[in-house]
Design a protein with these regions (language model features):
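Asp-based, Mg2+/Mn2+-dependent phosphohydrolase catalytic module
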Residues: 1-4, 9, 114-115, 122-205
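Short amphipathic alpha-helical segments and helix-helix/interface helices
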Residues: 24, 94-98, 109, 156, ...
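N-terminal helical cap/lid subdomain that shapes the substrate entry/recognition surface
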Residues: 2-91, 102-103, 114-117
Length: 205
């Protein structure tokens, strides 16, 4: 049972299953592993960070990838490969969101994401029994639209500024400890670190 009236959800590894193996296989298929695997190529991490902060567009990202790799590949190929990171949002989680809303909970989404991932989620992953993404959440906060990302304190402060949610009545669910700590320290939210993909569902029991 969740006793908080405001619940702020992360996206990846909380609602959306992340398929890193599928992503790396897609990169390998295009010959991009050494360029877009952040573990192998530090520039890739910087490029994705700029994309996640809204500092470059998807087209600019694709141009950078072609420049780095020297490969003759299309924007669509790059976008499709990047979106292979996204698995599914299980129906049980969509049902859980709808149940929480029906109980009068105020639901919010706060995600470090990128436009191509978000577009895919909106079109392919969130639709359910006639519901669209805006039916699940009162407000949606995305790093690339806010020009801020977690765990920077200002992103949490901006959510509070826009929503007016009270710290003592707010639960933040995120898979990363650093984000949970920052949310608690900067705005006083109660936090739950979702260490395994389905863990937060036990809060509903």
């Amino acid at each position: 049972m969740i006793n908080y009236n405001n619940i702020v959800f992360d996206l990846g590894n909380v609602l959306v299953h992340l398929d890193m193996e599928g992503y790396l296989n897609a990169l390998a298929g295009l010959g991009l592993t050494e360029y877009l695997d952040a573990k192998l190529h530090p520039e890739s991490r910087q490029l994705m960070h700029k994309l996640g902060l809204g500092l470059i567009s998807t087209s600019e990202f694709c141009n950078e990838v072609r420049s780095m790799s020297g490969l003759n590949i299309t924007n669509k190929q790059i976008v499709d490969a990047t979106n292979k990171m996204l698995g599914e949002i299980p129906d049980v989680k969509k049902e859980a969101l709808l149940k929480l809303k029906a109980q009068g909970k105020r639901l919010f989404l706060l995600s470090n994401t990128i436009d191509m991932h978000w577009d895919y989620c909106v079109k392919e992953l969130f639709p359910y029994k006639g519901y669209q993404v805006d039916d699940f959440f009162e407000n949606i906060f995305l790093s690339q639209r806010m020009y801020l990302d977690k765990p920077h304190p200002m992103i949490f402060q901006e959510v509070v500024r826009q929503t007016g949610i009270a710290a003592n009545d707010t639960l933040f669910i995120d898979d990363l400890e650093a984000n949970c700590q920052a949310a608690h320290q900067s705005v006083g939210w109660h936090v739950y670190q979702n260490k395994h993909f389905d863990d937060w569902l036990q809060l509903l029991v």
